[in-house]
Amino acid sequence: MKILDVGCGANKYEGAIGLDNNPRTAADVIHDLGSVPYPFADNEFDLIVSRHVVEHVPDVMAFVTELYRITRHGGIIKLVTPHYTNPDWATDPTHRNHFNSYSFNTFMADRQVFDFYTEVKLKPVKNYVSLANLWRAVGFEFIVNLDQKSPKFRFTRKFWEFYLSYIFRAKELSFEFEVIKEDSKNGETKLLA
C-alpha cells in the first residue's frame, strides 16, 4: 500500500511518504502545498492522510482536486481539521479556512447541488465530530455522531450543527472518503480521471 502524508510536519504517518512545504519537518518531498500540481503521478497512492492542513491551504477546491488526482480509484483520503466552533482555531494566524460537517459535500459523488464546481467524486466513509472534553464526557459526542451508525439519525448531526454547535462546541472533524474514478453508463465502465 502506497501512502502519502500531506503536510506531515514532524509526525509523519508510519510508512508514508511525507509531503510538506517546511524543510524542518519529517518530509521526504518539499513542495508548496498551495501550488498544484504536486510532484506525483496520477493515481499513485492508495491512501492519503492530511491532518490539520486543509485549513491552511489558499484554495480548498484545488487542494481536494489534487488529492483526488493522485489517489487511485477505490483509494482513501483522510482529512482532519478543526471545526469552525473550536475556540483554538483563531490562535493560529496561518489558518485560512473554516469547516463544518457538510463542508466537503460539493465533492461527493451523489451530490445534488453545485455539481458544476468540480469533477471530483468522493464517497463518504466517515464524518466524525470530536467535541470538547466536557461534552464528550457527558455523552453528547455520541449523540452528535449517531448518523455514523445509521442514516435515520442524520437529524441529530444537522440539529447540532445548525442550532447547538456554539453551545456544545466541537474540537475537530475527521473525514474519510473513498475515491470514485469509474463511472458506469450504459453498462460500460470508464475511468473518470
Describe the residue ranges of each PLM region.
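Conserved SAM-binding loop
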Residues: 1-86
